[in-house]
Regions:
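Conserved RNase H-like, two-metal-ion catalytic cores of nucleic-acid enzymes
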Residues: 3-4, 8, 14-53, 69-70, ...
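Extended two-metal-dependent nuclease catalytic cores across DNA- and RNA-processing enzymes
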Residues: 23-24, 73-249
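Active-site-proximal helix-loop-helix substrate-binding element of RNase H-like nuclease domains
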Residues: 99, 152-176, 183, 319-440, ...
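Conserved "right-hand" nucleotidyltransferase catalytic core of DNA-directed polymerases
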Residues: 230-336, 343-352, 402-580, 601, ...
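Active-site palm subdomain of RNA-directed nucleic acid polymerases
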Residues: 420-432, 436, 756, 760-781, ...
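Conserved catalytic core of nucleic-acid polymerases
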Residues: 445, 557-558, 562-565, 640-773, ...
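C-terminal polymerase-core module
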Residues: 467-471, 475-527, 694-742, 746-748, ...
Length: 829
């Protein structure tokens, strides 16, 4: 109820800096608009206002600039990616039926102040939404400031301000006059900080009161001198800090009742920005793309392409399976399901993996198309392939009944089939993704046996070691504290032990991994803290985390996700098998608790340097190809090339550095990241990269050509036709462009490697099924596959794995696989 006034610039800025960069396919940034709209919808729901307005600053100088030339002089200009979103934001707000208030010569704060004062005069409740504490001075019995915070907004009333600061809202002006405000370049009294300013105002009520009592014994000599020297600055700062309550704007509050929403304009704007989730939230459908655009051509092609061949639409709903002709699917009983799954009927699924999970079937014969997987291939940047999301994205009515939804899915299939056929990725769907779903579901059902007692005992050891280290940390600190608290840890490191630090921020000192790494040789407490963190993470994330997901059968059944990554790699959850730590000896111990059941062994097959072999193949670099063809260690060869040493002179340290350079090139990291990885200066890391690219000229040429082609086409592809669009290449922001170039370089390599792993999984699964061997594929972790096999056939399975994986695809260099057998995952390494 009441009036909601939003500080437009403040909320938009918070969204821009608080949300990772999002762009549409034309490179227009959308993160600020996305964040603002989410905030707006939340505010409308929470506050339910009768009247609403959004206040914005204008570029023109205000009366404060005329009063003080230095006002906000330290502010940098608005970032280009934010500036390009501002016009969109204002148009969207207007289309929402909300009034925007701007006034030349006045700031948004003054507009907010004037509106809130008008509300208070009329005894109408007013909520001010802002990320700026300057508005605290406006708070009274009718005006509440809702301060935007990451972990939940905070409501400031007179009582809350008194409790937090010990002063009244109006006295916040006096406090700011004394302490100044570095963000607005308000000088205040030099040398007076917030703590002193608050104590002075608590005692003397105002700036006038402070100067009237300048000789008081309650004011120390040092503070008195600062006050005397800074009196003129203090009074000027007070004028700058006080929000105007009489800005020349319309204060007839009834004029701010929201107008009817312009859904057509709103849909047009959000469609142009490709904000499909927001369209869905607002229950709007995308509009047609602008004539002549890439999107319009695709839409035109979609309309001309004939519908897909007749077949059954297969849907799941509330644990039931429905199948049948478009518009007429029927519910299948358990008995009917089994027969139907093995039938020759042409089937079109919506989320084949979910369908197999619900049905309990091992596979779905003659499944020709899957809507979810096709949508993933068409738009791998999305993180939502639900039916409602796809309907919003492609402008298809969703329907309510299962019969209507089958019509919806058929329409989506026609659109998506057109898209992936045009892009050449249809074969990725039919030959890789759909067959892979069968493999993933089988792996999830099988699970992997876990030694729960062993994990518990290991966890106890980890806790004991962490406890021992914590005692050593307390000895160095001189007292006990919460090591897990960045605030308390910062106090110990930078105040008690006086270690060098970056400047203290409002939230305290930074104690992140980079900071600790820079302090590693400054005090013996630092390596102990790093080790303590590693141990507590191991305990909390992996030991406790694994025990939580062990099923009644003594096995964990991880969920393998097929549509999560942009490169095509498989990810997993509950638990995330891909993240089981392997870099430290203690972390590697975790593998001991992944074990084969009684009478069985684990057979582990791991591709050797698959991404570098893919790089050699697609770049055609002769030196790298020769190394793989000759069976020479590629990292030793790279060390020889980069560091100009004969092969026999390459030391383990040089090989280690060369390995980091090799994989740094694959993952597209720059000199800064490489320097941190191998412990050298940034210039030295740059030198290594230049040397690498000069020696491996084929790779350098490939990188240049790939980036140039990606800039021209807007996308890159894997060897098999999986496409990834790189919107960042069209961005105006240089950092975004650089990121886009790195993605262009590494996606074809990583994506091709991911496709090869998937092809290998399908081949291994099918071969095991055909062989009759008592063995099941149970895990995929990065570049390795793990099979649980009966002891008497483990060696046969090892040969089968090696044969299928090494021959999954043909490259110009050999793919080699290391195969090991053991009772536990640890034993296979």
């Amino acid at each position: 109820m009441g009036f909601l006034i939003i500080d437009g610039n403040s909320i938009l800025n918070r969204a821009f800096y608080g949300i990772r960069v999002l762009t549409n396919s034309r490179g227009v940034a959308t993160n600020a608009v996305t964040g603002f709209m989410n905030t707006l919808l939340m505010l409308e729901k929470d506050v339910n206002p009768d009247m609403i307005a959004v206040a914005f600053d204008l570029k023109a100088p205000t009366f404060r600039h005329k009063m003080y030339d230095g006002y906000k002089a330290n502010r940098k200009g608005m970032p280009e990616d934010l500036a390009q979103q501002l016009p969109y934001m204002k148009k969207i707000i207007t289309a929402m039926g909300i009034t925007i208030i701007e006034k030349e010569g006045f700031e948004a704060d003054d507009i907010i102040g004037t509106v809130s004062a008008a509300c208070a005069d009329k005894k109408i409740p007013c909520t001010v939404s802002t990320g700026d504490r300057d508005s605290f001075q406006l708070v009274n019995d009718y005006v509440t400031v809702r301060l935007a915070k990451t972990k939940g907004d905070i409501y400031y009333t007179p009582d809350v301000i008194m409790e937090e600061y010990g002063v009244t809202p109006k006295q916040m002006i006096e406090v700011k006059a004394l302490m100044g405000d570095s963000s607005d370049n308000i000088p205040g009294v030099p040398g007076i900080g917030e703590k002193t300013a608050l104590s002075l105002i608590k005692e003397f009520a105002s700036v006038d009161g402070v100067y009237e009592n300048i000789g008081s014994t309650l004011i120390t000599k040092g503070v008195r001198t600062k006050l005397e020297n800074g009196k003129e600055s203090c009074y000027m700062s007070r004028q700058l800090a006080e929000i105007c309550l009489t800005a020349p704007i319309d204060t007839e509050l009834s004029h701010y009742v929201p107008k009817e929403r312009d859904d057509n304009e709103l849909a047009r704007l959000l469609s142009e920005l490709e904000m499909y989730k927001m369209l869905q939230k607002l229950k709007l459908h995308p509009t047609s793309a602008p004539a002549g655009s890439k999107e319009a051509l695709e839409e035109s092609a979609a309309k001309q392409i004939p519908a897909m061949p007749a077949g059954d639409i297969v849907l799941t709903q509330e644990g039931n399976v429905y199948a049948g002709a478009v518009g007429a699917p029927v519910k299948l009983s358990d008995v009917e399901l089994k027969a139907y799954a093995d039938s020759d009927s042409t089937k079109y699924t919506f989320d084949i993996k979910e369908t197999l999970t619900v049905t309990g079937c091992e596979r779905l014969k003659n499944n020709r198309f899957d809507t979810t997987l096709a949508a993933y291939l068409a738009d791998p940047d999305s993180n939502d392939y639900s039916l409602s999301r796809l309907c919003a994205q492609y402008g298809v009515p969703e329907g309510n009944s299962i019969q209507e939804k089958s019509i919806t899915v058929a329409a989506l299939n026609d659109i998506l089939n057109c898209k992936i056929s045009e892009t050449g990725s249809a074969a990725v769907l039919t030959d890789i993704e759909i067959p892979l779903a069968t493999v993933l579901v089988a792996m999830e059902r099988e699970g992997v046996s876990i030694d729960a007692d062993g994990i518990k005992a290991f966890g106890k050891q980890v806790c004991e070691k962490a406890e021992k280290i914590s005692r050593e940390i307390y000895e160095y600190a001189g007292y006990e504290f919460n090591i897990g608290s960045p605030k308390q840890l910062g106090s110990v490191l930078f105040e008690k032990l006086a270690l060098p630090s970056a400047k203290k921020t409002k939230t305290g000192y930074s104690t992140n991994a980079d900071v600790l790494e820079s302090l590693m040789d400054k005090h013996p407490i630092v390596p102990l803290i790093t080790e303590y963190r590693a141990l507590t993470k191991l305990q909390n994330t992996y030991v406790t985390g694994l025990l939580k997901v062990v099923g009644e059968d003594g096995r964990i059944h991880s969920t393998f996700k097929q549509t999560e990554t942009r490169t095509g790699r498989i990810s997993s959850a509950e638990p995330n098998i891909q993240n089981i730590p392997v870099r430290t000896p203690l972390g590697r111990e975790m593998r001991r608790f992944f074990t084969a059941k009684d009478g069985y062994l684990l057979v582990d097959a791991d591709y050797s340097q698959i991404e570098l072999r893919v790089l050699a193949h697609i770049s055609g670099d002769e030196i790298m190809k020769k190394a793989f063809l000759d069976g020479v260690d590629i990292h030793t060869v790279t060390a020889s090339q980069v560091f100009n040493q004969p092969l026999e002179w390459v030391t383990p340290d040089l090989r280690s550095k060369a390995k980091a350079v090799n994989f740094g090139i694959v993952y597209g990291i720059g000199a800064f990241s490489l320097s941190k990885d191998i412990g050298v200066s940034v210039p030295k890391a740059s030198e290594y990269i230049r040397s690498y690219l000069s020696k491996y000229s084929g790779i350098a040429h490939y990188m240049e050509q790939t980036v140039a082609k990606a800039k021209r086409d807007g996308y890159v592809e894997t060897m098999f036709g999986r496409r990834r669009y790189i919107k960042e290449l069209a961005a105006k922001n240089k950092n975004l462009q650089a990121f886009g170039e790195r993605v262009a370089k590494n996606t074809p390599i990583q994506g091709t490697a991911a496709d090869i792993i998937k092809i290998a999984m399908i081949k291994v699964y099918n071969r095991l099924e055909e062989s009759g061997l008592d063995a099941r594929l149970i895990l995929q972790v990065h570049d390795e596959l793990i099979v649980e096999a009966k002891e008497d056939c483990a060696k046969k399975v090892a040969l089968l794995l090696k044969e299928e994986m090494e021959n999954a695809v043909k490259l110009t260099v050999p793919m080699t696989v290391d195969v090991n057998i053991g009772k536990t995952w640890y034993d296979t390494h």
